Amino acid sequence: MDAAGASCSSVDAVARELLMATLEELSQEQLKRFRHKLRDAPLDGRSIPWGRLERSDAVDLVDKLIEFYEPVPAVEMTRQVLKRSDIRDVASRLKQQQLQKLGPTSVLLSVSAFKKKYREHVLRQHAKVKERNARSVKINKRFTKLLIAPGTGAVEDELLGPLGEPEPERARRSDTHTFNRLFRGNDEESSQPLTVVLQGPAGIGKTMAAKKILYDWAAGKLYHSQVDFAFFMPCGELLERPGKRSLADLVLDQCPDRAWPVKRILAQPNRLLFILDGADELPTLPSSEATPCKDPLEATSGLRVLSGLLSQELLPGARLLVTTRHAATGRLQGRLCSPQCAEIRGFSDKDKKKYFFKFFRDERKAERAYRFVKENETLFALCFVPFVCWIVCTVLQQQLELGRDLSRTSKTTTSVYLLFITSMLKSAGTNGPRVQGELRTLCRLAREGILDHHKAQFSEEDLEKLKLRGSQVQTIFLNKKEIPGVLKTEVTYQFIDQSFQEFLAALSYLLEAERTPGTPAGGVQKLLNSDAELRGHLALTTRFLFGLLNTEGLRDIGNHFGCVVPDHVKKDTLRWVQGQSHPKGPPVGAKKTAELEDIEDAEEEEEEEEDLNFGLELLYCLYETQEEDFVRQALSSLPEIVLERVRLTRMDLEVLNYCVQCCPDGQALRLVSCGLVAAKEKKKKKKSLVKRLKGSQSTKKQPPVSLLRPLCETMTTPKCHLSVLILSHCRLPDAVCRDLSEALKVAPALRELGLLQSRLTNTGLRLLCEGLAWPKCQVKTLRMQLPDLQEVINYLVIVLQQSPVLTTLDLSGCQLPGVIVEPLCAALKHPKCSLKTLSLTSVELSENSLRDLQAVKTSKPDLSIIYSK
């Protein structure tokens, strides 16, 4: 039997047979010499005690050798002891059989020797990666550094920090230093985590980063003194493999051959690293497999093995690096043991340029393509996602080679993907009804995979069934992959990227609707009305669906797929968005059973993250349409946009800004516990004293740009109808307050501002009140709940005395001691104070303060004071 194809148990059986045949060949005198020499033959510092060897016959010796060394290393140990015992003829015959039946690596003995051999094997296997077009490139040449930052849990932590403008831990570029930091604690006091979750959106480069970590480990750059063996586990592939396999089998799949001492490798879990790529594809364990696997030698389903690793019940103490999408992080939390999160944020602007120049071999073409994309601000922003960057480069390369105009660009991910399809088909010279039919079938395959627990691997039989095997679209849009199996190598196919599969899945819903005109878009409605867990899985598919409903997108679908999507699909989708303003729940008056309440409590934590992200995800869907009328109609039934506990990225703000531009009259925006502190990508180099002096003489220091500047600028435009802005439990740096102050001065539609439990400096308070007191400020209602109003009262007095339009001041829930009430009442009596309503709900006031307020009421009878404890 060939060593590479043998299972773990069959290799052990072959080793046992070799040992038995060899030792039975020895005479009693030779066996005696063998036992004495074996006593003095330690392996990794251990040897079999003499008391267990002294009276052992050949059969006993075989059992003890296997028990102590494992089967395959026991064969090599036996051969070496035979040589030292001067039984060279038997040793020579054993070596021949050993190499023939167990493979060349069976002559290795110590773990350190296997470790060195394994690193060399990993370097050979992973030196090159396949691009989406199946071209192999060196990983060091193609890998472009990404930004990696602490996980989103840090957003809430900002509220607990000291007042001021501390810069959060900045995003770091993914070099070896950053990768080495992943398994360190967040601070000096915390212990080193065993599980690190690397999260990010689709196409952001999680898999490439994970493979680069494996490659750098093998090159001796990462975890050198901590990890002896590192294994890459693609979750999607392991879930789809038929049959049962143990963790030991999965480890042997990655070794040069199956004769390796897997038990000894797994015997020290604290020296192992498992990279679980794509853990968002893991479903929950079915009732038939309720418990995770705990035995590395137990043959079971891939799901149980992976679940055992995630929960640290299988090989406790091993290090885990888990990659997943944002939407799945909440579902995984309950299955992970004390994880530490890190977030991949994609390319920095500097790294986008590096990627372009790595992609284009011609420097002039690279410069032209990069300059063109850089001038298109929206398209340039989209290129922070590596897969989108690759698509943009691929399309531009084709257009440059064909001498075409680069003017046709895209503003959304959907339009970029659609342009990619058309460009690839044109470059391949394929068109016509046959290819259109193949594309439809390919979309169906993509959709079936997405709905089947995000199935990403498709067999040759799957393609044959749909008549796609050997088709033109298979060659262009699917990558062929060979997976070594127990008996034979299995050939599978997968889409060039999972996000591209989700794009085609979204397209299939529209193509399905076209086939049944005049009937409700059942497939589309089923997608939109899926439950919370499925909605998280289908978030990107839903986003693409909205993008395809763009008028231009529908026209392209008609041109390239030969179909017309019914008008009612777009109208039904709009009605679905408008229906999101109505909370779903049990009928009024319905009573919940205790069992139902228990189930809801158990699911509450799991669904919390999906619910929190739904508001932002809905905005992304609207953004993808790039149709102002559609967005305005959609938001008309969503009077308040709520974003809660979101660390806003530049792309998030681009999306939010666009939706605010399109919002209808009376629109409100509420940001709750959102991260608004900009993190610098790179520390500035210190200038010399001479340069600093020259700079101070020639230039004036520019105020820092805040994350909210684009939104603040939008608020000042005549077409923006945002009426209410509530900032709750947010840290507001001075830069944000400065930009917001400028917006308050001239925003034509803003009528209400809320600052609820938000953290500001004195400078920030002064800036905001300056904007509120500006003659052209249109804010009529000001709601304030700040930790210490004593710091703001002097600025608030100025606003009350100078603002011509402020009519409502809500200080409900605030602490108002006499030192605050006294100047407040003086300002209310001021002749230029135009206030009509003062709300003091849930406020405790002293007797003196109540008398002061009564005096204000007497002098200004039109002022309504609402007070309750």
From Swiss-Prot:
Residues 194-511 form the NACHT domain. Its main location: cytoplasm. LRR repeats lie at residues 460-485, 635-658, 837-860. GO terms for cellular component: canonical inflammasome complex; cytosol; intracellular membraneless organelle; membraneless organelle; NLRP6 inflammasome complex; nuclear membrane; plasma membrane. Induction: Up-regulated by rosiglitazone, a PPARG agonist, in CT26 cells. Down-regulated by CRH during water-avoidance stress. ATP binds at G200, P201, A202, G203, I204, G205, K206, T207. Acts as the sensor component of the NLRP6 inflammasome, which mediates inflammasome activation in response to various pathogen-associated signals, leading to maturation and secretion of IL1B and IL18. Inflammasomes are supramolecular complexes that assemble in the cytosol in response to pathogens and other damage-associated signals and play critical roles in innate immunity and inflammation. This is NACHT, LRR and PYD domains-containing protein 6. It comes from Mus musculus (Mouse).
